[in-house]
UniProtKB/Swiss-Prot annotation:
Biased composition (Basic and acidic residues): 65-75, 245-259
Biased composition (Polar residues): 24-36
Subunit structure of this chain's protein: Associates with 90S and pre-40S pre-ribosomal particles.
Cystine residue pairs: none
Similarity comment text for this entry: Belongs to the RRP36 family.
UniProt-recorded name of the protein: rRNA biogenesis protein RRP36
Coiled coil: 48-78, 161-205
UniProt biased composition (Acidic residues): 76-89
Length: 281
């Protein structure tokens, strides 16, 4: 009995046949697109062969497209770099100019600035000159000014003011000084303003001293246990205490003048209240 030959399937042969079939269909598909025979042959091909054919076609199309793009870009570069052309250079768009060459490169901005609507008139101070020299000590942006601290820091100016007052008084008393009437009036006004300023500063210092002493007494009595809570003065109480302290510090003549001013002020107020007002009938 003769032993039968066992034939095994060869995968290599199948792959070769499928590759041949694929190349045959591709070449035929490029030449005869849309024919009926092509459709019949495509229906007989396996799905794996069709998939491989599709991927090959995609690769071929992509390669062809990149070659065309490279050719176009090289043509554009050639025509752009041609320096023999007589025509004006083409203006690049704003989008191209805004693009940075490198991400770490500094950003570019236009040097063109719009013209100011406010025209500078010769003879009038401009806004820039007005705000050029500003004293930050008196700027509202830095908060409210501390008058007590400013007075303490600039207390040495009182000596200069006193000396200036003495010089002005001696100049006015000197009969040999060749001053006309206008200059004398101007010096008198300056002297009066300086004296009034010195008086206001003295009164302010007196008020601050009285109020600070009162606060110290209240805090000491609170620490000793004499008072349960420190009492803070109202405006009316402050006014009374300050008036009493001012009257005590005044000279007799100054006190009489102050009393006379108060009396006249009160009388004027009473007369205004008793004025006859005609009624419209």
């Amino acid at each position: 009995m003769s032993r039968g030959k066992t034939i095994r399937p060869s995968y290599y042969d199948e792959e070769e046949s499928s590759q041949d079939e694929l190349s045959h269909t591709l070449s035929k598909g490029r030449s005869n697109i849309g024919s009926q025979s092509d459709d019949e042959e495509m229906s007989k091909i396996s799905f794996g062969a069709l998939n491989r054919a599709q991927s090959k076609l995609n690769k071929h199309n992509q390669k062809h497209k990149t070659q065309e793009d490279n050719y176009k870009s090289s043509e554009e570069e050639f025509f752009d770099s041609d320096s023999d052309s007589d025509g004006p250079p083409e203006e690049t768009s704003s989008k191209d100019t805004k693009k940075k060459k490198n991400k770490h490169a500094p950003s570019e901005s236009s040097s063109k600035r719009p013209v100011s609507r406010i025209r500078d008139i010769p003879g009038l101070p401009s806004r820039k000159q007005q705000t050029l020299h500003t004293d930050i000590r008196f700027d509202a942006a830095y908060g409210k000014a501390d008058l007590a601290k400013a007075r303490k820091d600039y207390a040495f100016l009182d000596e200069y003011r006193k000396q200036e007052i003495a010089n002005m008084e001696s100049l006015l008393k000197d009969k040999k000084s060749k001053l006309n009437d206008d200059e004398r009036e101007e010096i008198k006004l300056q002297l009066q303003s300086l004296k009034s300023r010195m008086d206001t500063l003295k009164n302010r210092d007196l008020e601050n001293n009285i109020l600070s002493n009162y606060k110290k007494q209240q805090m000491e009595s609170f620490k000793e246990g004499k008072v349960n809570k420190p009492y803070f003065l109202k405006r009316s109480d402050k006014r009374k205490i300050l008036q009493k302290a001012k009257f005590d510090s005044m000279k007799p003549k100054q006190r009489e003048k102050a009393m006379e001013r108060k009396r006249k002020k009160r009388l004027g107020k009473e007369f205004r209240q008793l004025e006859f007002k005609p009624t419209n009938r």
